[in-house]
């Protein structure tokens, strides 16, 4: 594959934990309960994907690893919810931008992600960026793999975040 | 160096709540190991200048990576043709096309770094008994996909708790 893809930047996140909820019966609204607890505990969710099909609900959320002890304390008070959550520690996000809603670009990035061998746990497009969740230990290596096929401007900013905004 | 700043709003500010109607939602479930093959197929779909309005993906089930892809109605033909390709059927565990659907989205200042946005939006919809098919948040964007005719009601519900210009 030639070096034909163009992007303005690639950004990597801080270390996060992936939280999943899967409910296969009606009558429970685990997402609402989870979001309420996180909101009340002032915990940000940098990534969220939630889908419902028939009576099944499946949600995937990212929480900064430093916030996980507070999140677990908040969730412990809701036993029904707590038993339905699964945690995958040490994940991170790679954001490539802009995607310009272009399927050729997005498809090529997905193909590269698949070829890199890094697992994909989640993906979401925003107004500009395409954000993918994978193992934190593989973030830098995956970003380097992408840059073998994606041209970035010579003056693009560093991959790693230079500031850390924390909600209090 | 640590800098502490306070950003507080009585009502959370957005840059506007938008609703798009008459959209197509394709939900394609694949085995995670087939990601590169799906990417290849998606890239080929893009050669026809097909634009996607939104893509979300996550593990709907443990060994199943579900892609939710939203397109404008004018791309429906390409989408149906795409989903019927043997090469796409071969890598898919299931394909569901839902149309028409409606998409509501909004962006706001520093949404990617702030807590409580998704909770406030979800709560406002729940109070009006408005169910979504898919919800996604990343960076400063929040997206919901609804069945037909729910978009305007959802916009009204969210307009009561978020500030819009």
List PLM regions with ranges.
Chain B
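A conserved regulatory-domain signal marking ACT and ACT-like small-molecule sensing domains
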Residues: 1-165
